[in-house]
């Protein structure tokens, strides 16, 4: 493991994947999910604050990557659900902009719905493959994760070609 090799040479390591996407990168409001020692995490705070708004130590080395995988798993579950809810709502004549406004103040609210125009399925398959590998290594069967892994392939196509118009910005 890289951390063990680094430790043998007196080098401190954190795993620190980032979340929240391009818009957060542009505004310096990234979320940094860290794994490593509390001392190394504390020393790094001045660095994280240059590009991130929030930073969390989740545990030992590897916990940051695990947290990132769980974030992405939930994002893609939600992204697929938004495509399906949007398609069903459009098929039933709903005004998606009005429905979105209502959902954003409901228990169905999500960051993906709030920022639908920025949701991209570019990395979704890779993300879900990571989740499935983690489940396999833990000896767990996760049927929702397996289904989402397959559905993100279609989700990517739909989002690029004919996505539900949650924001009223699609010109059809």
Regions found by a protein language model. Give the residues of each.
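Helical "substrate-binding/catalytic lid" subdomain
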Residues: 62-172
């Amino acid at each position: 493991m890289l951390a063990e090799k680094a430790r043998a040479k007196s080098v401190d390591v954190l795993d620190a994947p980032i979340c929240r996407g391009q818009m957060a990168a542009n505004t310096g409001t990234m979320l940094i999910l860290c794994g490593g020692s509390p001392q190394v995490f504390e020393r790094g705070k001045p660095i994280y604050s240059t590009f991130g708004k929030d930073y969390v130590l989740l545990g030992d080395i590897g916990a940051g990557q695990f947290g990132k995988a769980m974030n992405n798993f939930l994002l893609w579950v939600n992204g697929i659900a938004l495509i399906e809810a949007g398609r069903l709502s459009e098929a039933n004549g709903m005004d998606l902009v009005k429905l979105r406004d209502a959902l954003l103040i409901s228990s169905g609210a999500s960051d993906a719905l709030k920022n639908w125009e920025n949701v991209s399925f570019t990395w979704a398959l890779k993300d879900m493959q990571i989740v499935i590998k983690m489940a396999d290594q833990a000896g767990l069967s996760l049927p929702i994760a397996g289904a989402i892994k397959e559905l993100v392939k279609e989700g990517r196509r739909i989002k690029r070609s004919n996505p539900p118009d949650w924001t009223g910005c699609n010109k059809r």
